[in-house]
Swiss-Prot record:
Keywords: Early protein, Host cytoplasm, Host G2/M cell cycle arrest by virus, Host nucleus, Host-virus interaction, Modulation of host cell cycle by virus, Phosphoprotein. Residues 21-59 are annotated as: Disordered. Contributes to multiple aspects of the viral life cycle including viral genome amplification, suppression of suprabasal cell differentiation and egress of newly formed virions. Induces host cell cycle arrest at the G2 phase by associating with and preventing the nuclear entry of host CDK1/cyclin B1 complexes. Inhibits cellular DNA replication by preventing loading of host replication licensing proteins MCM2 and MCM7 onto chromatin. Within the cytoplasm, associates with host kinase SRPK1, a splicing factor regulator, and inhibits its activity. Pfam families: Pap_E4. It comes from Human papillomavirus 51. This is Protein E4. Assembles into oligomeric complexes. Interacts with host CDK1. Interacts with host SRPK1; this interaction may favor expression of late viral transcripts. Interacts with host cytokeratin components KRT8 and KRT18. The major E4 form is first synthesized as an E1^E4 fusion protein from spliced E1^E4 transcripts, such that the first few amino acids of the E4 protein are derived from the N terminus of E1. The gene is E4.
């Protein structure tokens, strides 16, 4: 036998509200938020990477790698030094 206790007995402060009615069923929780997965082109990402980058005669560049970083350094024709450090 299922005996339900009135809401006013379980929660006496609800008596302070006028015309309060206990919901028939609990309100469902919103769905968990998750970031959308990025869409990729049909090409495989590994096809886009070159194991050894081509050397440009106009703007030579160097690459240095460590266990957790990749560094690219180039010198433009104007003499500007460009450095890029990617931390993995």
């Amino acid at each position: 036998m299922d005996c339900e206790v009135p809401a006013a007995t379980r929660y006496p402060l609800l008596q302070l509200l006028n015309n309060y009615q206990t919901p028939q069923r609990p309100i469902p929780l919103p769905p968990a938020w998750a970031p959308k997965k990025p869409r990729h082109n049909s090409e495989n990402d590994s096809d886009l990477l070159s194991p050894t980058p081509p050397q440009s005669p106009h703007c030579p560049w160097t690459i240095q790698t460590t266990k957790y970083t990749v560094e690219v350094e180039a010198l433009t024709l104007e003499g500007t030094k460009v450095q890029l450090r990617l931390r993995l």
